[in-house]
Curated annotation (Swiss-Prot):
NCBIfam families: HI0507 (TIGR00645). Keywords: Cell membrane, Membrane, Transmembrane, Transmembrane helix. It is a multi-pass membrane protein. InterPro entries: UPF0114, UPF0114_bac. The keyword Cell membrane applies. It is found in: Cell membrane. PANTHER family: UPF0114 PROTEIN YQHA. HAMAP family: UPF0114. Belongs to the UPF0114 family. GO terms for cellular component: plasma membrane. It comes from Pseudomonas syringae pv. syringae (strain B728a). The keyword Cell membrane applies. This is UPF0114 protein Psyr_4257.
Length: 162
């Protein structure tokens, strides 16, 4: 009976595979939104104010960071919790494949969230005249919460490894 439960629990890791595949569909949706934003800005490029162009570019950078985060979670999560990726030797491999454990994945995710939050905060500050001061305060508090959390996770990871 114990062996059955252990084998069933171990096999249940494959339930994560469609979730990671679903993230790739999310990446496709993000890609479509990215190009929608580009095609939206191109016809207006010469009439667009510099600040508005910077806001669009920050939005594109934000999407690129989220896309990278999705790829990182998808691939390393699959490798850590489902199965190793068997990529042909003649194919190009990402240099971090097979090297990112769940601890380093958490740190990369935390760093990505801080970067994404920073971009969002910069976009908010560029439009600060249209945002209530108490909202600005909360944006900064939330961002600092992400920064402190990422720092604390890194510190705890360092302390527990040594």
């Amino acid at each position: 009976m114990e062996r059955f439960f252990e084998n069933a629990m171990y096999a249940s890791r494959w339930l994560l595979a469609p979730i990671y595949f679903g993230l790739s569909l999310g990446l496709l949706a993000l890609c479509l939104k990215f190009f929608q934003e580009i095609f939206h800005v191109i016809p207006n490029i010469f009439s667009l104010a510099e600040a508005d162009l910077i806001l669009v570019l920050l939005s594109l950078i934000d999407m690129a960071l989220v896309g990278g985060l999705l790829v990182m979670v998808m691939i390393s999560g699959y490798e850590n919790f489902v199965s190793q990726l068997d990529i042909d030797e003649d194919k190009e491999k990402l240099n971090w494949l097979g090297t990112m454990d769940s601890s380093s994945l958490k740190m990369k995710v935390a760093a990505s969230i801080v970067a994404i939050s920073s971009i969002h905060l910069l976009r908010v500050f560029m439009d600060a005249t249209n945002i209530k001061p108490e909202y600005l305060m909360w944006y900064v508090i939330i961002h600092m919460t992400f920064v402190i959390s990422a720092f604390a996770m890194g510190y705890l990871d360092k302390v527990t490894k040594h």
